Design a protein with these regions (language model features):
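Conserved N-terminal phosphate-binding loop of PLP-dependent enzymes in the Aspartate aminotransferase
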Residues: 1-428
């Protein structure tokens, strides 16, 4: 294919043309390409295929809902039963007490919904200077304009003629609480609307929080009247062995952002859980209550909501959140054993999501390309790391086989020459 019609996401098109992998079917934790290759999905696609691919009961739910009503919006006076049922279910499992639910079409939508809402909230309560959003270096918060602007991945903000598409953002060190404190002092708490963070940083290289980090961050947020947003687009719905990572890491967010695992990828859906402090001004002032002017065409989509409900039922019925916690222990053991490899600089884990970070002399992208030949789909992350985050239905041995393949590929990546610790570029 020399000139494809499809412009792939996040792709250097001249490099991928002619080497694209066309995935045509899946079953469980495996995918099949148009060449007949059967590949283990070691990343659960983009962190979301938690219950595995091509479950017939999910297809049946979609079919039955479409036969009744495929979609209807939830703007103004209108609503629908599936959106109501899903919202009630999410409230019942939320780490936030008595939240309200805003539904939309995915993670990037949800980030924009959360960030716009905190700006609107502060204006409503008369604190109109509180506009700045603080995030962490190397963080990823989607690719809509606001998410791109707050992201800590510099390469996602480059090329648009300004540091931020939306003004009023700042980034702090991902581990250093002191940097956050200094940034509050520099910008002024009276100007800061919110702090946003992934409980476990994903695309930035799978960085779990250091002990005590979020306790101190939350203390500073409370003391300085800064709203705290937990971006659980990746970690939500079992990825860290709890339904939400906020529970595991004892977070008390004002807003939780979710997507991905809420449907396990069977339909596009995301949303936010909003704490009473933030939602009350929009509900409890009668005629003087403001309207939050936000919504998407497919907010509360019936088929997506029905699939989310079935997905949550499957997670509970099959004990897959507990299974994720058990798989974390297997993955942790395997990562510990690979950490001593000559080409590995670190192996990190936070829930059933981990990464193998490689030395600069070898390319994570090249290793992930080679792993496809061994039957495993992985993905390069920031920091020259390899993403590992399989579905929750993965077998213990499949985790071991995956890490065995990583070791084999690293073992066969021979340096051109070696002089003590100084090495030439690796040829693989």
């Amino acid at each position: 294919m020399t000139n494809p019609a499809l412009w792939s996401a996040q792709a250097h098109m001249p490099s991928v043309i002619g080497r694209q992998i066309n995935v045509v079917s899946g079953k469980g934790a495996y995918l099949t390409t148009d060449t007949g290759a059967r590949l283990f999905d070691a990343t659960a696609s983009l962190w979301y295929a938690n219950i595995g691919h091509a479950r017939e009961e999910m297809a049946e739910v979609a079919y039955e809902q479409m036969k009744t009503l495929e979609a209807y919006h939830v703007f103004g006076r209108y609503t629908n039963n599936r959106a109501i049922e899903l919202s009630e279910k999410l409230v019942s499992i939320s780490p936030i007490d008595d939240p309200k639910v805003i539904l939309n079409s995915g993670g990037s939508d949800s980030i924009d919904a959360a960030l716009k809402l905190v700006r609107r909230y502060w204006n409503q309560v008369g604190r109109t200077n509180k506009k700045v959003i603080i995030s962490r270096e190397h963080s990823y918060h989607g690719l809509h304009a606001y998410g791109t602007s707050v992201a800590g991945l510099d390469y996602n903000r480059e090329g648009y003629g300004s540091d931020s598409l939306v003004e009023g953002t700042a980034r702090v060190d991902k581990h250093d609480v002191g940097d956050f404190s200094a940034t509050i002092e520099r910008i002024g708490a009276e100007n800061i609307a919110a702090y946003i963070a992934e409980p476990v940083m994903g695309t930035g290289g799978v960085h779990p929080p250091r002990k005590g980090y979020f306790a101190e961050i939350q203390r500073l947020c409370r003391e300085n009247d800064i709203l705290f947003i937990a971006d659980e687009v990746i970690t939500g719905f079992g990825r860290t062995g709890e339904m939400f990572a906020s529970t595991r890491y004892q977070l008390k967010p004002d807003i939780i952002v979710f997507a991905k695992g809420v449907t396990s990828g069977y339909a596009a859906l995301g949303g936010i859980l909003v704490a009473p402090r933030v939602w009350q001004p929009f509900f409890e002032k009668g005629k003087s209550s403001p309207i939050y002017r936000h919504g998407t065409t497919y907010s509360g989509h019936l088929v997506s909501s029905a699939l989310a409900l079935k997905n949550l039922e499957i997670l509970e019925r099959e004990g897959l959140v507990a299974r994720s916690a058990a798989l974390e222990q297997i993955l942790a053991s395997e990562l510990k054993s690979i950490e001593s490899h000559d080409f590995v600089t670190a192996a990190r884990i936070g829930g059933f999501m981990g990464c193998v970070e490689l030395s600069n002399e070898i390319s994570a992208e090249s290793i992930t390309d080679r792993l496809i030949e061994y039957g495993f789909i992985t993905r390069p992350l920031r920091g020259n790391a390899i993403q590992i985050s399989p579905p929750f239905i993965t077998k213990d041995q499949e985790v071991r086989d995956l890490l065995s393949a990583v070791r084999t590929v690293l073992d066969r990546a021979k340096p051109v020459c070696r002089m003590g610790k100084a090495r030439e570029k690796i040829a693989i």
